[in-house]
Amino acid sequence: MQDELISVILPIYNVELYLKECIESVIRQSYKNLEIILVDDGSTDQSPYICDEYAKMDSRIKVIHKENGGLSDARNVGIQVSSGSYIALVDSDDLIAQSFIEELYECCIKSNAMIAVCAYSKFSNGDEIIISNNQGNAQIISGRELVKQIYCGQAGKFGFVAWNKLYSRKLFDSVQYPFGRIYEDTFTTYKLFLNSNQIALLNKSLYFYRIRPESIMS
């Protein structure tokens, strides 16, 4: 099942304290056929250096240094240069389980879904990360029905955030993240959902969202 190239895009801005841990969680993925795109969005700390050092150690890593343009712009740049059949967007202060890509890709292939979504857990520094042992089958739902459930508050952790998902690359042919817009995830993800006939929902926490005072959105 490990034949298609998958692009993992990390938008990066001043996250030197967390970046190594995030990159390590990506390069250790059980699914190995990855293109890892690190988009340094004009960082003023050691993040650019960390990106370059990891690129020397892993040939799958591509680094882009650009002027600061915000989270949406960094994501768009990464998507534009990506070559994978599927795309995952990982915030550079978060972590992903070792099987994150493999399990979501398997959901897409088995159900012919254009997007696969997993549950997520929040954590703070020092917290123990626990990966769910849930081995249940993914729920298959239409994009339109999922949007309806989200707006009705019935979707749980399968919402409009960008980062706990695997997307078919084709979806971004006509959709971009809006420059300078607040809640850019919501503005974009609902469009991606509506353009997807089928979405796979995996009720298993494979993405770990770090809670910290400052964030990549600042």
PLM feature spans:
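Nucleotide-sugar donor-binding/catalytic module of glycosyltransferases
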Residues: 1-218
